Amino acid sequence: MGLSGKNVIFVGGLGFIGYEACKQLMAKNMASFFVFDVLDKPEDIKALQALNPKTKVYYTKFDITSKQSIKSALADVVSKVKYIDALINGAGILTDLNVELTMNINLIGLINTTLEGLPLMDKNKQGRGGVIVNIASVLGLEPCPPAAAYCASKFGVMGFSRSIGDPYYYNITGVAVVTFCPGLTETPLKNNIGSKYTFEYSKKISEELNNTKTQKPEVCGAHLAQVVESHENGGIYISNQGTLAKVTPTVYWQPTYH
């Protein structure tokens, strides 16, 4: 799906990977670009707008842990531009010391935003179809002992995205669901592995993990922008050490209705 002339929302667009992806997306000649974030960085918003005057950039102060904030922000988008064509769910934290906050931001907030946004995009309701990109992690595909709670949240994102991205739903709504899984990237989130691990026993292996080869946020952001345009329902992509690769998950069981 080309993004030219489209209306795009990026939840968590002022983080490191998110902001790099935002800069890439500004080259796509979108009609409007809505950045939702708890962070308030007016200079970053101005810098985005300066990249392409053809795209109108909006900033919304956003609390992903609040259903009311989610509902109000999405309603505001529809009131301004009528249609939502792409929704990118990129808010996330890594702090295994606070399990509730980890789940509320990484998983529950993403689920609530998707469930609130998808009906607004549904071609059988008030939308015209589109794409939802949920940002999970390579730690949503494989376990990582130093960050067990974070892993659980990202495994949840993967399970939710694969379920709601079933062809049954896509054929009805016209809304594709794609999952993007960054590997270790040079951001403050990566640094948290070394200080906010699951158990005291985790310290040694978390420090070793911190020494793993990483990638630049600019590279990961470019991959994310590419995935947004793919519009491949059910697609799962890994961005790791500078390479973007499609993932085919192992299927152990399928519902009988298929």
Swiss-Prot record:
GO terms for cellular component: cytoplasm. The keyword Chaperone does not apply. Signal peptide: none annotated. It comes from the Eukaryota. Gene3D superfamilies: NAD(P)-binding Rossmann-like Domain. Coiled coil: none annotated. Its EC number is 1.1.1.1. The active site is at Y150 (proton acceptor). NAD(+) binds at residues 9-33. It catalyses: a primary alcohol + NAD(+) = an aldehyde + NADH + H(+); a secondary alcohol + NAD(+) = a ketone + NADH + H(+). InterPro entries: ADH_Ceratitis-type, NAD(P)-bd_dom_sf, Sc_DH/Rdtase_CS, SDR_fam. Keywords: NAD, Oxidoreductase. The keyword Lipoprotein does not apply. Pfam families: adh_short (PF00106). GO terms for molecular function: alcohol dehydrogenase (NAD+) activity. Substrate binds at S137. Homodimer. Belongs to the short-chain dehydrogenases/reductases (SDR) family. This is Alcohol dehydrogenase 2. It comes from Ceratitis rosa (Natal fruit fly).
